[in-house]
Amino acid sequence: MGKINIKWVVCTILLVGLSTLESNAQQRWFRTSSLEFGLIGGFSHYSGDLTRTHFESRSFKPSVGLITRYTPGQLVTFRLSAQYGQVEGRDDWYEDKADPERRNLSFKSDLWDFTAAAEFNFNQLDFRDKSGVIPYAFIGVSVFKFNPKAQFIYDPSSPVAQYLGQPIYSQLADRDGEWVELQPLATEGQETTEFNEKKRYSLTQVAIPIGGGLKFKLNHTWTLGLEYGLRVTFTDYMDDVSSTYVDPVRLSQQYGPMSAAMADRSAVLKAETDRDGNPMYRGDPSKNDLYGIFGATLTYRLYGNRPKCPTF
């Protein structure tokens, strides 16, 4: 019996194993890896205390970014993306402006999203094909940056102006129409003397991206994709709204009159507690905020590699 060539045995096993993953087993060689770079554009949106439906069309804002994909085999693709967009929510999309009990809160924020994820391809990739459709799902981890702002409207006749007194409220006269950053104002009493245990929320947070889409191979090098990805966050403060009201005087004494003015913008000031001593809620702390991104991707494949036999 002749001597067995280990090199060719290993090579044959590799080829047989790879061919079992290929829908067309009659083809011996195929490309098994690729690196792609491209653009992603679409719309970002927010869902939280200031929206009543998850897909609130008025919250959709343009989003743009870059994406890279690396496919080491056929069924899994690893991706990195960086995107910029905006999110927004407003009570006055839903509230009757004549309602004296309306909350009248609003916000908008720039949004930076950095995501690393794994795509699971439901069709096996074969880069020899000039065209084809590949459904996929993805999950990973995202780091996002946000900074909620709201527009201050100077109104000496407002309830908060009357409550604070004109000498104090008039300090804000030259800031009418200004878009004010809300996190530094601690609008829910964070780190005040009375609520020192409530810490300010961080403007950089982590989320879990979950989504899916379709990739359309246009030719050997270009791929068009359509997808939606939900970001499950661990914060309820994307909109600066989460828990309870705080007495405006307390806020004004600790952080200035702007904090009081932006914390309660209703037509009738809300007390810290109701008649039964229960907290007056400004938001719903039991549910975290969410955001999502609808995207269209266009990527260019730089290279693909064929499997090689090991060298001994």
Q: Which residue ranges define each predicted feature?
A:
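Residues on the lipid-exposed face of transmembrane beta-strands in outer-membrane beta-barrel proteins
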Residues: L39-F43, L66-Y70, A116-F120, I139-V143, ...
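Gram-negative (and chloroplast) outer-membrane scaffold detector with strong preference
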Residues: V76-V180
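Structural signature of outer-membrane beta-barrel domains
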Residues: S44-G48, S81, G85-G89, S142-P148, ...
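Short loop/turn motifs that connect adjacent beta-strands in outer-membrane beta-barrel proteins
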Residues: A25-S34, L75, Q124-V133, A150, ...
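Short glycine/proline- and aromatic-enriched beta-strand/turn motifs that initiate or cap beta-hairpins
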Residues: Q26-R69, D289-N305
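Outer-envelope beta-barrel architecture signal
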Residues: R31-F37, Q74-V76, W112, D129-P135, ...
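Predominantly the C-terminal beta-signal and adjacent terminal strand-loop region
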Residues: N219-F312
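Extracellular loop and loop/strand-boundary signature of outer-membrane beta-barrel proteins
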Residues: D49-F55, D99-F107, F195-R200, Y281-D284
